[in-house]
Amino acid sequence: MHIVFLNPQGNFDPKDSYLTEHPDFGGQLVYVKELAQALATNGHKVDIVTRKIIDSDWPEFSANQDIYPGTEQNLRILRFPCGGNKFLSKEELWPHLSEFADEILRFYGESLPDFFTAHYADGGYTAALLKQRTRTPFSFTGHSLGAQKLDKLIESGGYWRDLDIRFKFSQRIAAERVSIKYADKIFVSTLQERDEQYRHPLYSGASNSDKSIKFSVSPPGVNRKIFNSVANQLDFSIKPKLDLTFGRSRSQAIIVSSRLDQKKNIIGIVKAFLERRPSLDRVQLVLCIRGIEEPRVDIAKLSKDEQFVLNEILDTIGRDLIGNNVHFLNVTSQLELAATFRYFADRGSIFALTSFYEPFGLAPIEAAAAGLAPVVTKNGGPSEIFSDDFESSSSAIILSLIH
């Protein structure tokens, strides 16, 4: 079977460049990559179709084709131009998706794939355009839906007009409605996602989650080749560096691994840690944020939104605690992240995820697979994966560390 993944935003390359360093390079890309590799390993012909970028700031994505070593016989990364050469964020892509669909059809000609699998609203909208012209069926995986993000931002004091200008919610939600209506199958991670997110009033008429035959609930999994409790050579190579920072006291730590995004609520775990510091005498708070090693220096290279998030964290922590009780780690790959998890798991540490809403819950599963005890948000996917016995993050953290 020939299967094509449609993922206009972000990009893909063998080095996983910029993963978690930009809002368009989040866990969705890991999901697409690993699912595509699994299908290729099982004998299917698979293409990941994304956007071609000719931009000196993003040099990894200028080639028409790329591969992942080990699956090159069955898996290709294909990049098609649309909207000019420069990198465009997902909010800037909407006017160019028709051109993207045209380029895809021009490439395949009469040799159309058997099936498209579309990711995020821009991929879904592209798939709907292609289905209209070729009748090729497609599945839709939303990853996160715009209506929930909009609700959270309005609850936080945002104004519709300002939010729509910035995040293009009108176009995103319209694209999600089209994707939902015309998809042959919709993949969700949890029952909550199906029964609550897709029943949001803004999807009324497009989505009927009572028609469960159209929905497939597929909980997130984890790549056990990377995230496991067995040490490898990388563990031994990073241990001296970590020992220099964290010493040989084997003190416990609270691990956070996230990009700098307000909805990830890193500030929530920082405040919870500071609130209970007297009870967490020798415990360290470790913020694993790709690209951030010296936060007061590295902040200059961040976007304005990321700078706002990091400044709030730094102001809350204060200068005295950074490097003493609170540490930033620049973890540059999934392999290094897994080794870092194992290092701290050996000290009886925990992983904390305090997002306002987390549709997937992939990160805490990866952390748990590497041996860390997870403390996670009750909002979204993690609530169906982990039990919830605590009233607050700070209480959960203390009891998890004790046990």
Model regions and ranges:
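Catalytic cores of nucleotide-sugar-dependent glycosyltransferases that transfer UDP/GDP/TDP-activated
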Residues: 1-401
